[in-house]
């Protein structure tokens, strides 16, 4: 039986959602059952039904959206009790000295603000939208 994976995301301009949709496509192709939801809707789910949980969050003006840390705080016990991952999407990750979990300032700052310790961390370069 396939593991059931939750992909919860917080996005500002849709790029993090796009990354999660791609992850969903790949994981489904590998035989995984995947539920993809905005983090605002994840509270309505019974998180105990998921064997694995991944949270993706974008940076806007130097910060992840507050609902990300709030969701993590509310569900800390469940997140800590199973394989879990977190990734940050931010524009500075395009630079080689800021494109890894151990050197991305936004991810490192966020991890200091929460007590959850995901087993897997990731950083993706964000999309910069220029006004037309």
What residue spans do the PLM features occupy?
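FMN-binding flavodoxin-like domain, especially the glycine-rich phosphate-binding loop
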Residues: 2-4, 18, 26-30, 35, ...
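Short, contiguous strand/loop micro-motifs
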Residues: 10-11, 59
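Glycine-rich NAD(P) Rossmann-fold beta1-alpha1 loop
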Residues: 11-18
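Short loop/edge segments at beta-strand edges and connector loops
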Residues: 38
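Short amphipathic alpha-helix with an adjacent loop that forms part of the alpha/beta core around
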Residues: 42-49
